[in-house]
Curated annotation (Swiss-Prot):
The glycine cleavage system is composed of four proteins: P, T, L and H. Transmembrane segments: none annotated. Belongs to the GcvH family. This is Glycine cleavage system H protein. InterPro entries: 2-oxoA_DH_lipoyl-BS, Biotin_lipoyl, GCV_H, GCV_H/Fam206, GCV_H_sub, Single_hybrid_motif. The gene is gcvH. Binds 1 lipoyl cofactor covalently. It comes from Xanthomonas campestris pv. campestris (strain ATCC 33913 / DSM 3586 / NCPPB 528 / LMG 568 / P 25).
Length: 131
């Protein structure tokens, strides 16, 4: 299993959130999730300006095996999307925690971040899933 970055927060549905410090949160899917999905062939991005709700679908990733919703970890407004994923969805497979980010949300309520899983808790969830 790949290393889980210590600066991220997670949802049980395998999305990650990186708090940028300027009231913005970058969102992607975990390396575990991309591994389960296999080779990604398409990413449906939200539109800049869309309002997203914590726990609701905001994007879709499709592999040769399945399509999966990407849930927003926080409520807010989409301020940026990773448009390069339209041409290269496999970037998520190659670098899930870096270049494979999906969208950025300007967060409405920073308290929501406290409800997300810390890296250690996420690692524990993955271990439990494996048994």
């Amino acid at each position: 299993m790949s290393e889980i970055p210590g600066d991220l927060k997670f949802l049980k549905s395998h999305e990650w959130a990186r708090v940028e410090g300027n009231g913005r949160v970058t969102v992607g899917i975990s390396d575990h999730a991309q591994g389960l999905l296999g080779d990604l062939v398409y990413v449906e991005l939200p539109a800049v300006g869309d309002t997203v709700q914590a726990g609701n679908g905001a994007a879709v990733v499709e592999s040769v095996k399945a399509a999966s919703d990407v849930y927003s970890p926080v409520t807010g407004t989409v301020v940026e999307v990773n448009a390069s994923l339209s041409d290269k969805p496999e970037t998520i497979n190659e670098d899930a925690y870096g270049e494979g980010w999906i969208f950025v949300v300007e967060i409405d309520d920073k308290e929501q971040l406290n409800e997300l899983l810390a890296p250690d808790d996420y690692a524990e969830l993955l271990e439990d899933d494996a048994h």
